[in-house]
Design a protein with these regions (language model features):
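Terminal helix-to-tail segments of small alpha-helical proteins
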Residues: 8-10, 14-20
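Post-HExxH zinc-binding segment in Zn-dependent metallohydrolases
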Residues: 78-109
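Short intrinsically disordered terminal tails
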Residues: 1-2, 109
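Soluble non-cytosolic domains of exported or imported proteins
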Residues: 56-61, 77-81
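Structured N-terminal alpha/beta-domain signature
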Residues: 4-5, 68, 82, 90
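Active-site recognition of the HExxH zinc-binding catalytic motif
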Residues: 64-76, 84
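Active-site scaffold of zinc-dependent metalloenzymes
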Residues: 17-59, 70-73
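Short acidic-hydrophobic surface loop/beta-edge motif
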Residues: 2-10, 38-42
């Protein structure tokens, strides 16, 4: 079963931790999009991010994915570099410097 919780970086955003028991609709979209996705914008009352917990990621990698997806929501942008910059700032402000370095080093910005 998926865990649904508030994002550790913004309590106005729901976070779904996707596992093998998660709805196939969500898993299919994750398989197309990568390790996470964000649902936000016009008509979405509460933004939702989904983080793929099936991949055996480290805690820092999971934090990096969550922060990147929160970056999409907070910036209101689907642009990857914009979300990446916001994610790095979010992680640094929260003291997660190793996770921020993961985003810095992956080549999006």
């Amino acid at each position: 079963m998926s865990t649904v919780r508030l994002s550790r970086f913004d309590h106005g955003i729901l976070c779904i931790e996707a596992t093998e028991e998660t709805s196939s609709t969500i898993l299919d979209r994750l398989d197309q999009r990568g390790l996470g996705m964000a649902l936000f914008g016009v008509g979405v009352e509460t933004p939702i991010i989904v983080v793929d917990h099936r991949q055996g990621l480290t805690p820092d990698q999971l934090l990096a994915v969550e922060a990147h997806e929160v970056g999409h929501v907070l910036s209101g942008s689907t642009d990857e570099p914009t979300a990446e910059l916001h994610g790095i700032a979010i992680l640094r402000l929260a003291g997660h410097h190793a996770a921020a370095e993961l985003l810095l080093n992956r080549g999006i910005i």
